Amino acid sequence: MNYFNKLCFRKRINEIKKCRFMKENEFKNENKILKNKKIVIVGCGSQGLNQALNMRDSGLNISFALKKNSILRKNSSWLNATKNNFEVNDYESLIPNADLVINLTPDKQHENVVKELQKLMKKNSCLGYSHGFNIVECGEIIRKDITVVMVAPKCPGTEVREEFKRGFGVPTLIAVHTENDPKKIGLEIAKAWAFSTGGHRAGVLESSFIAEVKSDLMGEQTILCGLLQTASLICYEKLIKDKHNPSYAAKLIQYGWETITESLKHGGITLMMDRLSNPSKIKAFKISKKIKKILSPLFKKHMDDIISGSFSKEMMIDWHNNDKKLLNWREDTKKTPFEKNILSYSEKISEQEYYDHGTLMVSILKSGIELAFETMINTGIINESAYYESLHELPLIANTIARKKLYEMNIVISDTAEYGSYLFSEAAYPILKDFIMSLEKNVLGLSLPNTKIDNIELYKINEEIRNHPIEIVGKKLRKHMKEMKSICVAK
C-alpha cells in the first residue's frame, strides 16, 4: 500500500514540508562513521558506479553485490564494476557482512531486490536508497532493526562523477525513514555518505523520504526532462520550417540547452535573461508568460497525480506489462527528426550566439522553471527543495543532451524519470506545438533587431524577474556553492 496515502493528513503535510538547508559545520566529522565499514552497493548502473567511484576516492571500502546470473553472464553491471577494479560478488557472499547496503538498482526492481536483501542483512545494519519511491509509493516495510536512510544527488549518476572530478559536487537531499531509525544514527550515516559523494560542497538539504519523492517526480517529469524533450523536438521542427540548415538547427538545440543553462548555476533566471539583448529580453519575457498560461493546467495535473499516487499506480501497471508504454515511447523518440539528424555542422557557434539565436529557448526555460517551482510550493513543498528540483538540476540534465541528444538523457536518468518524461512530453507536444510554430522567425535561429526600448517597461520586467520567489531562494542557496566550477560550453 502507498505509504504516503496511509498517513494521517497532518503527518502528510509535515512530511512533505520537511526541508532544512544544512550548515557547513554539520559535516565537520566528514565520513568518519563509515571509515573501515563494509559498504556494499547493489546495482552498478549510472548512479551505482559513479557514487561508488566518488566514495572510494573519499576513502571508503566499496564492493558490489550482483545477482549470480549477472556475474555468470558478465552483464553491463559486472563489466562496469570489474573494469573499475571493484570487488564483485553475489548477494549471499557480501550482504551478510555489510554494515551499509546501498540499493541503487532501478526503481522497478526494488520490491524483489529489497525482499532478498532483508533476508541476508545482519542485525542492526543500514539500508540506503538514492530515491524513496520503494518506501513511499510501494509502501515497502523494512525490518525494525535496520536503519533506513537516503542520499539523493539531484542529477544523473554521470554528473555526480563529473562534478566531483571538477572539485565540486551536486546538491543532495538526505533523509532518514521515520519508521526505521532504531539506534538514532541514521542522520550521521546519511551525512557521511553525502560527504563521500561530494554533495556537501554544493549544498545538502535534510528532507524526508516523502518530500524527496514527490518533488523529484514533479521536477523530472516537467522542467528537467519532459519539457526539455518536448522543446527540443518542437524547436528543431520550427527551425526546419523556417528554412534553417538542418545540421545547424540540430547543433543549436543539442548544445544550446547546455550553454544557456550554465548561466542558471551562477545567477539564476536573472543572469540567463541578462545575457539577452534588451529587445530579446522583453520578447522572451512576453513569450514566457504565454507559455506559462498554456502549460499551467498540465503542470498542475502532473502534480495532482503525483500527490494522489495515481501516476505511480499507472507506471507500476506498465512495469508489470513489460514496460510496453515506456518502450514504445522510447522507440518513437528515436524516430523523431531531431534524433535522426546526424550532426555535421562543423563551424563553431559562439557562446553568445546560443543566446542571441535562442530567445525562444530562454523563454521556454524561464516558463518551465517558474511553473514547476510555483506548482510545487503551492502543494506544500518548501522553496529550497523546489529550487533544487526545478532550477539547479536543469544544467546537469542539459549536459546529457549535449552528449548524445535525447537518447543520452533518457538512458542516464532513472526508469521513473524516463517514464514520466515521456508521459509529460506526449501531452505537452500537441499543446505547445501550434503556439511555437506561430511565432515569428527571429525568436529562434536569428537575432532580434535592435529596436527602441521603453525604459519603464524594461525596468518593470527586470523587477519581476529578480523578485520571483525562486530567484530569492536561489540567491541564498548559491552563496553556499563557493566551489562551483564552470563547464566547457559553446561548441
From Swiss-Prot:
Annotated NADP(+) binding sites: 44-47, 67, 77, 107-109, 157
Catalytic residues, chain numbering: 131
Reaction catalysed by this enzyme: (2R)-2,3-dihydroxy-3-methylbutanoate + NADP(+) = (2S)-2-acetolactate + NADPH + H(+); (2R,3R)-2,3-dihydroxy-3-methylpentanoate + NADP(+) = (S)-2-ethyl-2-hydroxy-3-oxobutanoate + NADPH + H(+)
GO MF entries: ketol-acid reductoisomerase activity; magnesium ion binding
Keyword Oxidoreductase: yes
GO annotation, biological process: isoleucine biosynthetic process; L-valine biosynthetic process
Entry EC no(s): 1.1.1.86
Keyword flag Acetylation: no
Pfam families registered for this protein in UniProt: KARI_C, KARI_N
Superkingdom to which the source organism belongs: Bacteria
Ranges for domain KARI C-terminal knotted: 208-344, 345-484
SUPFAM superfamilies (UniProt xref): 6-phosphogluconate dehydrogenase C-terminal domain-like, NAD(P)-binding Rossmann-fold domains
Residues the record lists as binding Mg(2+) 2: 216, 389, 393
Enzyme class name: oxidoreductase
Positions annotated to bind Mg(2+) 1: 216, 220
Chain sites annotated for binding substrate: 414
Family stated for the protein in its record: Belongs to the ketol-acid reductoisomerase family.
Protein name: Ketol-acid reductoisomerase (NADP(+))
Natural source organism: Buchnera aphidicola subsp. Schizaphis graminum (strain Sg)
Gene: ilvC
